[in-house]
A protein has these predicted regions:
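N-terminal positive-inside, membrane-proximal cytosolic segments immediately preceding the first
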Residues: 1-16
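Hydrophobic membrane-insertion alpha-helices, especially the h-region
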Residues: 12-29
Length: 142
């Protein structure tokens, strides 16, 4: 009878340990999934921002250097700046601050880009700041 009791106790201990390990595994898997999903969202938003920044920079250069108001349309620039600013919310607070600075500079300088090298340089400088911030966040992902 004593041997049966020992087997029952051993069985109960094994069941409890299996349950604990099962719950811990589930918790870890859930945490890992959420973390990976968050990193993926940041990565996708970052790549989209980098593409939009390159497109905005091309827009600025077409407007200033090529005097091409079709490729350098300020309306297209406004759309790109707005999209960059919206996507920066998904990346990092530092990138949101940089994109806000880009939007502020664009608001101030967009009408002078066609004629002023200083305005062009100011906008391009802010574009570079947002790029640097975005690259920094991408490097930190694991």
């Amino acid at each position: 009878m004593e041997k049966i009791q020992e087997k029952i106790v051993t069985y109960q201990i094994i069941v409890m340990m299996s349950f604990v390990f099962g719950v811990l595994g589930f918790i870890y898997n859930n945490w890992r999934y959420e973390h990976n999903e968050n990193n993926n969202n940041i990565r996708v938003a970052s790549f989209q921002i980098i593409q939009e920044l390159a497109s905005l920079e091309q827009n600025v250069y077409a407007n200033h250097y090529d005097n091409d108001m079709h490729k350098g349309s300020p309306r297209d620039g406004w759309v790109k700046v707005g999209l960059i600013n919206d996507l920066a919310l998904f990346i990092d607070p530092k990138c949101k601050i940089s994109s806000d600075a880009l939007k502020k500079t664009w608001t101030k300088e967009w009408s002078h880009i066609h004629t002023s090298k200083k305005s062009t340089d100011n906008v391009v400088k802010e574009i570079e700041n947002v790029k640097a911030c975005t690259r920094s966040v991408l490097r930190e992902l694991y």
